[in-house]
């Protein structure tokens, strides 16, 4: 990885990695802190093979977009995705919603973020852009038991209110450009690779 981490930006200005991460995400919904997640899986865990296949029809299926090595050069998102609402990410704490050519996305991505949506229900882009959630650090999210084991803290409001959390914002809604050959991001939430490494 040292070679990739130190690659000349003239050779490749956007580097992406595949990682499996579990972020401790919370969102305040109707005045109450609730656990949420970046996932296209059915919230009840009852995903079937057909639903999984449909979810992956567009995009390769990754949820992290590549890190840009040098500003002012090729930008993976700007080069390959049109901005439909909001802004392209400016910070690693900005996440985006990816939609397909019909401006639809994976409904489970929205349900898993606490949006109350039904199949085929239309929701305005402006109702999504600007949504904020907290990324809780492990020290706030987990409680140590007398046995030495750790379990998730049951007081989600205290976890949500912890000043050491990082606030994330859905900054924009993007759609793959017709001219793009780099349709890597599946419909749903996409975030900077840098977010998953901090």
Protein language model regions, located:
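Basic-flanked hydrophobic alpha-helices used for secretion and membrane insertion
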Residues: 1-198
């Amino acid at each position: 990885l040292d070679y990739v981490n130190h690659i000349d930006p003239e050779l490749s200005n956007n580097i992406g990695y595949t990682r499996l991460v579990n972020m401790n995400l919370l969102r305040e919904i109707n005045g109450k802190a609730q656990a949420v997640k970046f996932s296209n899986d059915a919230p009840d865990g009852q995903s079937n093979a057909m639903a999984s296949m449909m979810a992956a029809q567009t995009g390769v299926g990754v949820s992290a977009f590549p890190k840009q090595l040098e500003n002012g050069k090729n930008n993976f998102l700007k080069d390959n995705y049109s901005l439909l609402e909001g802004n392209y990410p400016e910070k690693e704490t900005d996440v985006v919603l990816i939609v397909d050519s019909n401006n639809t996305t994976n409904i489970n991505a929205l349900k898993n973020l606490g949006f109350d949506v039904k199949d085929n229900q239309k929701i305005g882009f402006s109702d999504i852009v600007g949504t904020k959630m907290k990324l809780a650090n492990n020290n706030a999210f987990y409680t140590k038991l007398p046995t030495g084991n750790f379990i998730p803290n049951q007081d989600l409001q205290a976890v949500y209110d912890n000043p050491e959390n990082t606030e994330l914002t859905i900054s924009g809604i993007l759609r793959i450009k017709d001219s793009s050959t780099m349709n890597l991001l599946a419909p749903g939430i996409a975030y900077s690779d840098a977010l998953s490494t901090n």
